[in-house]
């Protein structure tokens, strides 16, 4: 009976038009004289793709983050292309391409990057998509976090802009006419440094909870503010983040760690309420590891030991130190198992039991992969061996340390100990870290290392523009 009621109710839901989500439903064109984007700033291989698509009577534009970054005088990481050609039609035009994806098929076009010694470069080409039906009728019950097959239908540029996450990521650039096409007010929001969800934020976040993480990440990364309604909706929907697939969550964490400002981003997550949802009890444990005098004061996230450790890791990353996902995760978890860093570990339980009891629930909570769980466990187990040395034992260490240093987990364990001791400003621990730093060490494999994106400080390149002719 209840299911029947929902079906009847859905029939009478007021269906919104796409135009209600768009500031400029007909699309505002910002011409060359009123913006500073030039084709010389675009990826030359991306331009080749667009030119070939246009010659074959298709529409094709650059889209998303590359336009946003260029307007902010940043170097885009990727140049994505969007078109009204279907994946099969794109594949026919480019022999050097492959169709990928299950939920929604896109095309990867491959080139050799001359800047990176002929390393393989990928330009992602997607087809304009329609707005999901649940966005238009406001029916949150239709949202399925695993499959959106019925909503992954081809659409128009207008529909594609309306279904994107934030206004700042919804801009198109037509290199043929050198025109920015703006349906959502994204150009104004970039100029005013505002992160604004397109359409109702509650629906957008429930549709894809990763958008909450991205909003919290972009705020410090771009020096933007999250628009009030978009921010409040994160607080209401923060537990939706736990529905995200573990691979996507891992990918987002990796992106955060690569930025070189992970401490600022984690502070942003804390302000939104997402940090406590993702890492329950971590902030409380970190505060407990502060002195009584400091605990008596009003403590911000950035003042906590966990934030200090991340700040040190960020600086090391900027200095091209080799860090990994498991090092960063261990730095976040460290306050939960802080006793392992000190030689006088005296608990009724064994050190293995102590670590597992405190971390296993968090591993399950975050869906951390088994191999990463094992490595983080090894990192913390190794802390006592690293800490149980002194300069007077140096000769003994020289005889025995090499075997320990050759362990696959040693480098990560050592880096966690070193960063922990620096954050604690513990001279004795720092000296012990220096002992272990002498001589060769086995480093993690290249594919496990985090490479910083080295973002430049934000600097706008806007000129004043006028509201011009509409599409």
Regions found by a protein language model. Give the residues of each.
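Catalytic cores of the polymerase beta-like nucleotidyltransferase superfamily
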Residues: 1-471
């Amino acid at each position: 009976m209840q299911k029947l009621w929902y079906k009847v109710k859905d029939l009478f839901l007021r269906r919104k038009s796409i135009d209600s989500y768009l500031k400029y439903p007909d699309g505002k064109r910002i011409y060359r004289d009123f913006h500073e984007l030039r084709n010389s700033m675009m990826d030359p291989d991306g331009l080749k793709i667009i030119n070939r698509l246009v010659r074959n009577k298709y529409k094709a534009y650059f889209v998303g983050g590359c336009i946003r970054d260029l307007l902010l005088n940043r170097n885009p990481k990727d140049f994505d292309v969007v078109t009204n050609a279907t994946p099969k039609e794109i594949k026919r035009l480019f022999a050097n391409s492959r169709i990928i994806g299950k939920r929604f098929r896109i095309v990867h076009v491959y080139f050799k990057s001359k800047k990176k010694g002929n390393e393989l470069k990928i330009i992602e080409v997607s087809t304009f998509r329609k707005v999901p039906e649940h966005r238009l009728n406001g029916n949150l019950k239709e949202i399925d976090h695993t499959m959106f097959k019925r909503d992954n239908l081809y659409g128009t540029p207008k529909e594609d802009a309306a279904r994107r996450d934030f206004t700042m990521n919804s801009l198109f650039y037509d290199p043929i006419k050198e025109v920015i096409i703006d349906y959502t007010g994204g150009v104004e929001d970039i100029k005013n440094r505002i992160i604004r969800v397109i359409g109702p934020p509650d629906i957008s976040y429930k549709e894809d909870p990763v958008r909450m993480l991205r909003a919290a990440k972009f705020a410090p990364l771009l020096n933007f503010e999250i628009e009030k309604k978009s921010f409040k909706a994160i607080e209401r929907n923060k537990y939706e983040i736990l529905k995200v697939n573990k691979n996507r969550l891992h990918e987002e964490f990796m992106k955060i760690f690569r930025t070189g400002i992970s401490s600022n981003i984690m502070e942003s997550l804390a302000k939104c309420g997402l940090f406590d949802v993702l890492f329950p009890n971590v902030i409380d444990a970190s505060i407990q590891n502060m002195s009584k005098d400091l605990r008596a004061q009003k403590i911000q996230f950035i003042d906590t030991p966990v934030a200090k450790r991340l700040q040190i890791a960020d600086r090391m990353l900027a200095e091209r130190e080799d860090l990994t996902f498991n090092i960063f995760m261990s730095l976040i978890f460290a306050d939960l198992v802080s006793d392992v860093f000190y030689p006088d570990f005296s608990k009724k339980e064994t050190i293995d039991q102590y670590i597992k009891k405190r971390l296993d629930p968090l591993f399950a909570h975050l869906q951390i992969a088994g191999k990463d769980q094992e490595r983080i466990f090894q990192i913390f187990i190794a802390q006592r061996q690293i800490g149980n040395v002194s300069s007077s034992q140096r000769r003994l260490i020289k005889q025995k340390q090499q075997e320990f240093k050759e362990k696959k987990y040693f480098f990560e364990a050592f880096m966690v100990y070193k960063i922990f001791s620096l954050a604690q400003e513990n001279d004795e621990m720092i000296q012990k870290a220096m002992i272990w730093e002498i001589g060769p060490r086995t480093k993690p494999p290249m594919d496990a290392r985090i490479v910083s994106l080295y973002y430049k400080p934000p600097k706008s390149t806007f000129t004043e523009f006028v509201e011009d002719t509409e599409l």
